[in-house]
Amino acid sequence: MYLFQERIYNFGAGPAMLPNEVMEIAAAEFLNYKGSGMSVMEVSHREPLFEDVITEAEILLRKLLNLGEDYSIAFFSGGATLHFSALPLNLLKEGESFDVAHTGIWTKKAWEEGLKFNEVNVIYDSTNNHFTDVPVLTDSNLSGKGKYLHITSNNTIYGTQYPEIPKIKQIPLVADMTSELLSRKIDVKDFGVIFAGAQKNIGPSGLSLAIIRNDLLGISGRKIPILLDYSVMVKNRSLYNTPSTYSIYIAKLVFEWLLKLGGIEAIEKVNEQKAKLIYDFIDSSSLYVCPVQKRARSKMNVVFLLKDKNLDSKFLDEAEKNGLHGLGGHRLVGGFRASIYNSMPLTGVQKLVSFMKDFESKI
């Protein structure tokens, strides 16, 4: 039984909070979308009513990212993990390899999945620093054999983030941006492929998207499972089969919300303010500590520990009672994690820091 009659602050890593404004629009349109007498989730993906939704979603995303016509967008049913299989199949011929900078669980999963199809060259491994830092990568770090470089730009579990996107010129840069896409300004031309699960900054779970430079489509010559084939999905405008229609609709609303705020430039300033507020407090505290190197601290996932682990359960229990949900760290690392994606308002972080101060004062 839930104790709260109003919305709480969800700091979970994902599925994450959605903007209240988006939820209100979705609720208002749920039973009768644009006078159709149907919910969006009931509309056929072949009807013009939904085709307008997916077309508008792509237009809005292109506007947010200043995306040129030399890149294509495709929406997929399923999370970012499916791209761990899709990428080598789409980008590599048999016998070729790719490079990976290993900075956490998600690069390890991409590496392991890639080995089912091709060789993988690990050009950086942050295991020895316990995944508390990320590398500064240039062409000089490349293996010389790989056809692309795979990175995870923000690591949700360990709370690390590339402060600057690597400038790789010799081969395409492929980035898993699941937990940070649309949170800060990027130059898409720095990438060959960007992919992301939706459940952090884009929309509900069960949806992912890929942004693919057009010259990388159809280059492998391999037999690719149809729903993993980037060329097929692009050619069919993500409508080869029934897509995650309602998730795409929510993503469209999120894109509209973000543009209304002022776009990525505006939300980046808010995200920097939120991250600074919580990191500054942690660094000044005698109870809390952040294990991540300062240069590599994520602005999306703030990882921290209590110096007295005996207080962990008490901290979580009291946080929940105060409407601060999902602060437990990942099961592999423990501790705590505050995920402060785009939809987390500044007031949520202010309330969290106030609670943390109050909790410390009572110890």
Curated annotation (Swiss-Prot):
Disulfide bonds: none
Record-listed pyridoxal 5'-phosphate binding positions: A80, T81, W106, T156, D176, Q199, N241, T242
Matches recorded under InterPro entries: Aminotrans_V_dom, Aminotrans_V_PyrdxlP_BS, Pser_aminoTfrase, PyrdxlP-dep_Trfase, PyrdxlP-dep_Trfase_major, PyrdxlP-dep_Trfase_small
Cofactor note: Binds 1 pyridoxal phosphate per subunit.
Keyword Cytoplasm set for record: yes
Main location: cytoplasm
Binding annotation for L-glutamate: R46
Cofactor: pyridoxal 5'-phosphate
Keyword Cytoplasm recorded: yes
Protein EC: 2.6.1.52
Catalytically driven reaction(s): O-phospho-L-serine + 2-oxoglutarate = 3-phosphooxypyruvate + L-glutamate; 4-(phosphooxy)-L-threonine + 2-oxoglutarate = (R)-3-hydroxy-2-oxo-4-phosphooxybutanoate + L-glutamate
Top-level taxon: Bacteria
Any GO MF annotation of the entry: O-phospho-L-serine:2-oxoglutarate aminotransferase activity
SUBUNIT field: Homodimer.
Function: Catalyzes the reversible conversion of 3-phosphohydroxypyruvate to phosphoserine and of 3-hydroxy-2-oxo-4-phosphonooxybutanoate to phosphohydroxythreonine.
PANTHER family for the chain: PHOSPHOSERINE AMINOTRANSFERASE
Protein name stated in the entry: Phosphoserine aminotransferase
The species this protein was found in: Leptospira interrogans serogroup Icterohaemorrhagiae serovar Lai (strain 56601)
Organism classification: Bacteria, Pseudomonadati, Spirochaetota, Spirochaetia, Leptospirales
Gene expressing this chain: serC
